[in-house]
Curated annotation (Swiss-Prot):
Main subcellular location: cytoplasm
Any Gene Ontology biological process: carbohydrate catabolic process
Keywords: Cytoplasm, Lyase, Schiff base
Matching CDD domains: DeoC (cd00959)
UniProt organism field: Photorhabdus laumondii subsp. laumondii (strain DSM 15139 / CIP 105565 / TT01)
Pfam family, one: DeoC
Top EC group: lyase
Catalytic activity: 2-deoxy-D-ribose 5-phosphate = D-glyceraldehyde 3-phosphate + acetaldehyde
Subcellular location: Cytoplasm
Protein name: Deoxyribose-phosphate aldolase
One GO cellular component, as annotated: cytoplasm
Gene name of the record: deoC
One MF term in the entry's GO annotations: deoxyribose-phosphate aldolase activity
EC number(s) recorded for this UniProt protein: 4.1.2.4
Gene3D superfamilies cross-referenced by the UniProt entry: Aldolase class I
Amino acid sequence: MTDLTAAAQRALSLMDLTTLNDNDTDEKVTALCHQAKSLAGNTAAICIYPRFIPLARKVLREQGTPEIRIATVTNFPHGHDDIDIALAETQAAIAYGADEVDVVFPYRALMASNEQVGFEMVKACKVACAEADVLLKVIIETGELKEASLIRKASEISINAGADFIKTSTGKVPVNATLASAEIMMKVIHEMGVGETVGFKPAGGVRTAEEAAQYLALADHIMGDKWVDARHFRFGASSLLGNLLNTLGHQGQKQSSHY
């Protein structure tokens, strides 16, 4: 097994296979569930809009992969600063049966020097998730924050408020995951000493096995080569799957989405 095929195999098992499009349908979500089960192994999770969760749960169970987790999104994609709405959406996602919730941090508020609303939003969502044993990922939207100091601050606030994961991006803005932002975020996890409990998720723009391998190498370098597993690292992606399967010698159905 070459280094690239090893990285591809690793990346496949860490994927949150995603469809978050306005034109998503029951048929598209069903197809996504089928794709999450491949000849090369299963993805860690799928990530879909909340209304599709009951359908996905049924499809995953019927195809014999109930262990594939279901993630969804709240306060998405704009990251507004209304805590009550973000919390209500998160509670609704939990009621739909989500295993994981990816909530968008109110990043514009932070850019306007309001640190408190982000802390309070993440904390409120964490309380709701913890009661239901649901994992909370916080999307800080690095491509909009841009500045290293803001990316660092959003990461710190999210972790201090109880995030189980910090995630780069919604995939809905011009700049999504980058190695530079990934380095900042993982260094925060490392420097805060929370690597046991807090994971990292690059999302959007990771489309090839080569790109995935770069993120995995960076994680191994910063966090140590025993850290990366599905509890501590995920890729948010859709088109990546087809490339990974090709790299592994399996011609898979490719996603049309460009997340």
